[in-house]
Swiss-Prot record:
SUPFAM superfamilies: ATPase domain of HSP90 chaperone/DNA topoisomerase II/histidine kinase, CheY-like, GAF domain-like, Homodimeric domain of signal transducing histidine kinase
Membrane topology of this protein: Multi-pass membrane protein
Database matches in PROSITE patterns: HIS_KIN, RESPONSE_REGULATORY
Every GAF domain range: 158-307
Protein family: Belongs to the ethylene receptor family.
Primary location recorded for the protein, binned into one broad class: endoplasmic reticulum
PTM-bearing positions, type Phosphohistidine: 353
Post-translational modification: Autophosphorylated. Phosphorylation at His-353 modulates the interaction with EIN2.
Keyword Disulfide bond: yes
Name assigned to this protein: Ethylene receptor 1
Length: 738
């Protein structure tokens, strides 16, 4: 009998039960072996896993458990001791690994629980971030709507368009049932329904501004929910409505524009507001959200700014229209003034010509009478007539000069002259009158005063004569002193600053008298044309009141200044003026040529047999001019028209006197035709002299452009015509008196 080293099963075998256990252990073993493989796979795929050793222990535990189940398959039947030993070893290892894993889990489980806590924290954080993102999206959406509404509002500067656009865009953006704007009335005591969303022309009814709901809204800058039944919220019929929509109201500031007065705008002596009311659709559960209220508040502020801009634009356009109307009126006034000035100048020109013609006869005949044998009484009368005529001629020249000064047509005629000689000539002219009144006159010229200067000699002499003449006229006793010096800085004329250079200097002339003096309050009137103060003179003193007015304008034209100083009535006065003069750079020889009318050679004085042609449309003037020439020994032929002059003139005539004040320009063109007539015999062409009553510079320039040889200003005396003939026959071109 063979011996078997086997172990019998512990209980009798049941074939069916054994099969189920066998199959179960097999699948348990397969599961235990597959779980570690899956864990190893996922751990390798995971980039971060903090419990790798625990996983190794857990895997070993599972593998050993699977091994015990697999070995247990051989224990259901008779098996050898080796199988039992293997089974025991596997269970011991499984027990060790299981205990180690259990001990390790004591430390791992709290960490695993904290992971869950972190997960919950992260979920809460994520939910909070989602809420914040929703708020940001809401704010962004609100901002987008605000920008869109602002763009629509700012796209125009018309007040009515702004308000209507605001209501339309708010109604579209917020899906409103109604939106309205209440504007304060002019008195500010009521609110008037001015604009609504659904009605183009709302019924204009008002509510008192002292309503509690209005005070509540005006008391805060936030949008306020109000009752749908409040007076300002009754915008649409409520019949048939189950539930009215929620209503909010917000104030719209009307910005104070201190520099503008806007029509149809409330008086803004105190802070004023308009009221904007917004209603959600009725019969709906919709409510106002915070971001919608914020949108309404921002839009209200934007509307306030846009309204202020529109108001400024309206006032600017109104001011522009007013300015355009004023400009049109000013332009019309300017044209009328220019027309009046032209009419005045034309009138003065005509009157000048018409008055100079009889004066020409008076002065000419008086000068002829002076050449005859007269008794002392007759000579005195003739001299009186001549002086009165010359005074009248001077007055006419003053009026014409003033007219040209005022319209800016008068210009200075600059030239080099002897300044010292000019002062001496002025004294020579004034001394006869001063001697009669027993008034001594002294002339003081500063040592550094230049002798030869560049300026308008005639106008400077006229200024000095006017001022010195006034000193003589209004002084009954005492003395008169004339001082000339180079101007230095003077603080008394605060608005006039002297800036001399190497090419010019400022001449100061002081005329001091011991006459009647001037009341200080009358000094500002002195330089007013046609003005004579009672303290200064009476009408018996003579004069037109133009002398100082013209002198002031001449001084201004010479870039100077003039003023008068007086301590009061009976204390005399001092007239002071500064004028700008150029410093002459000419040589001594050329300077000597600037000395006025000092003949260097004997002048012609015998004109016997000189054939002269006189053309003048005025019979009296023609006769007087002929008489002067005949008295000088000339053989005179007279004509009354241009055609007759052109037909009569011949090479026998040495001089032709022609009146250029005749109507039209033919009187100038006749000079050109005379030049053409003598083209082949230029040396036989007669000298052409213009007789003119116009003292302006344009007459002289026109005469030069038409080829005339000289100009003689009416009225003409015997000495004038003698000097002209002498100068022409030397020969040299003369433009006398211009």
């Amino acid at each position: 009998m063979e011996v078997c080293n086997c172990i019998e099963p512990q209980w009798p075998a049941d074939e069916l039960l054994m099969k189920y256990q066998y199959i179960s252990d097999f699948f348990i073993a397969i599961a235990y072996f597959s779980i570690p493989l899956e864990l190893i796979y996922f751990v390798k795929k995971s980039a971060v896993f903090p419990y790798r050793w625990v996983l190794v222990q857990f895997g070993a535990f599972i593998v050993l458990c699977g091994a015990t189940h697999l070995i247990n398959l051989w224990t259901f039947t008779t098996h050898s001791r080796t199988v039992a030993l293997v089974m025991t070893t596997a269970k011991v290892l499984t027990a060790v690994v299981s205990c180690a894993t259990a001990l390790m889990l004591v430390h791992i489980i709290p960490d695993l629980l904290s992971v869950k806590t972190r997960e919950l924290f992260l979920k809460n954080k994520a939910a909070e971030l989602d809420r914040e993102m929703g708020l940001i999206r809401t704010q962004e959406e609100t901002g987008r709507h605000v920008r869109m509404l602002t763009h629509e509002i700012r796209s125009t500067l018309d007040r009515h368009t702004i308000l209507k656009t605001t209501l339309v865009e708010l109604g579209r953006t917020l899906a409103l049932e109604e939106c309205a704007l209440w504007m304060p009335t002019r008195t500010g005591l009521e609110l008037q329904l001015s604009y609504t969303l659904r009605h183009q022309h709302p019924v204009e009814y008002t509510v008192p501004i002292q309503l509690p709901v209005i005070n509540q809204v005006f008391g805060t800058s936030r949008a306020v929910k109000i009752s749908p039944n409040s007076p300002v919220a009754r915008l649409r019929p409520v019949s048939g409505k189950y539930m009215l929509g929620e209503v909010v109201a917000v104030r719209v500031p009307l910005l104070h524009l201190s520099n503008f007065q806007i029509n149809d705008w409330p008086e803004l002596s105190t802070k004023r507001y308009a009221l904007m009311v917004l209603m959600l659709p009725s019969d709906s559960a919709r409510q106002w959200h915070v971001h919608e209220l914020e949108l309404v508040e921002v839009v209200a502020d934007q509307v306030a700014v846009a309204l202020s801009h529109a108001a400024i634009l309206e006032e600017s356009m109104r001011a522009r229209d007013l300015l355009m109307e004023q400009n049109v009126a000013l332009d019309l006034a300017r044209r009328e003034a220019e027309t009046a000035i032209r009419a005045r100048n034309d009138f003065l020109a005509v009157m000048n010509h018409e008055m100079r013609t009889p004066m020409h006869a008076i002065i000419a005949l008086s000068s002829l009478l002076q050449e005859t044998e007269l008794t002392p009484e007759q000579r005195l009368m003739v001299e009186t007539i001549l002086k009165s005529s010359n005074l009248l001629a001077t007055l006419m020249n003053d009026v014409l000069d003033l007219s040209r000064l005022e319209d800016g047509s008068l210009q200075l005629e600059l030239g080099t002259f002897n300044l010292h000689t000019l002062f001496r000539e002025v004294l020579n002219l004034i001394k006869p009158i001063a001697v009669v009144k027993k008034l001594p006159i002294t002339l003081n010229l500063a040592p550094d005063l230049p002798e030869f200067v560049v300026g308008d000699e005639k106008r400077l002499m006229q200024i000095i004569l006017n001022i010195v003449g006034n000193a003589v006229k209004f002084s009954k006793q005492g003395s008169i002193s004339v001082t000339a010096l180079v101007t230095k800085s003077d603080t008394r004329a605060a608005d006039f600053f002297v800036v001399p250079t190497g090419s010019h200097f400022y001449l100061r002339v002081k005329v001091k008298d011991s006459g009647a003096g001037i009341n200080p309050q009358d000094i500002p009137k002195i330089f007013t044309k046609f003005a004579q103060t009672q303290s200064l003179a009476t009408r018996s003193s003579g004069g037109s009141g133009l002398g100082l007015a013209i002198s002031k304008r001449f001084v201004n034209l010479m870039e100077g200044n003039i003023w008068i100083e007086s301590d009061g009535l009976g204390k005399g006065c001092t007239a002071i003026f500064d004028v700008k003069l150029g410093i002459s750079e000419r040589s001594n020889e050329s300077k000597q040529s600037g000395i006025p009318k000092v003949p260097a050679i004997p002048r012609h004085s015998n004109f016997t047999g000189l054939k002269v042609l006189v053309m003048d449309e005025n019979g009296v003037s023609r006769m007087v001019t002929k008489g002067l020439l005949v008295h000088l020994g000339c053989e005179v032929t007279t004509v009354s028209s241009n055609e007759e002059c052109l037909r009569v003139v011949s090479h026998e005539h040495k001089v032709v006197f022609m009146d250029v004040c005749m109507p039209g320009v033919e009187n100038y063109q006749i000079a050109l035709r005379i030049h053409e007539k003598f083209t082949k015999q230029r040396h036989q062409r007669p000298l052409l002299v213009a007789l003119s009553g116009n003292t302006d510079k344009s007459t002289k320039e026109k005469c030069m452009s038409f080829g005339l040889d000289g100009v003689l200003l009416k009225p003409v005396s015997l000495d004038n015509i003698r000097d002209v003939l002498s100068d022409l026959l030397e020969p040299r071109v003369l433009y006398e008196g211009m």
